[in-house]
Amino acid sequence: MKVELKILNKELIKELPGYATEGSAAIDLRACISESIYLKSGECKLIATGIAINIANPNYAAMILPRSGLGHKKGLVLGNGTGLIDSDYQGELMVSCFNRSQETIEIEPLMRFAQLVIVPVVQANFEIVEDFSQQSVRATGGFGHTGV
């Protein structure tokens, strides 16, 4: 699948986004900043990536996810949980970063701080109904209904 990637900040030429291994599901996003940003405990900031993408296919979207090591070891996660990039969005990718740790976290220029994965999307045709055509076994059970 072809996705156009536009480099908005020439500093990224030094460290182009790409897949780390043949089996990588996502590309690492780099902090496209001129100087380090310090996130205090409980603080949330938008970090520029210096790139824009053009998926141009409504059957796909992109998701921005935290890097597992940074989330687990440092407490750096996404402020919005997951970033969803629609297929028709063409602006710069910005990442909401949240520090859930007790320590200040430094985000350095060109640091790999998040990741981007392309995922398939199905757009549903919703039909307004009074009752569902079939009752599932689960029905309305939720929030621990099948066990905790």
From Swiss-Prot:
NCBIfam families: dut, PRK00601.1. Transmembrane segments: none annotated. GO terms for molecular function: dUTP diphosphatase activity; magnesium ion binding. Belongs to the dUTPase family. This enzyme is involved in nucleotide metabolism: it produces dUMP, the immediate precursor of thymidine nucleotides and it decreases the intracellular concentration of dUTP so that uracil cannot be incorporated into DNA. It comes from Francisella tularensis subsp. holarctica (strain LVS). The keyword Metal-binding applies. One of its GO terms (biological process) is dUMP biosynthetic process. Coiled coil: none annotated. Its cofactor is Mg(2+). It catalyses: dUTP + H2O = dUMP + diphosphate + H(+). It holds the Pfam family dUTPase. Pathway: Pyrimidine metabolism; dUMP biosynthesis; dUMP from dCTP (dUTP route): step 2/2. Substrate binds at R67, S68, G69, N80, L84, I85, D86, M94. The keyword Metal-binding applies. The gene is dut. It is an enzyme of class 3 (hydrolase). Its EC number is 3.6.1.23. It comes from the Bacteria. Keywords: Hydrolase, Magnesium, Metal-binding, Nucleotide metabolism. This is Deoxyuridine 5'-triphosphate nucleotidohydrolase.
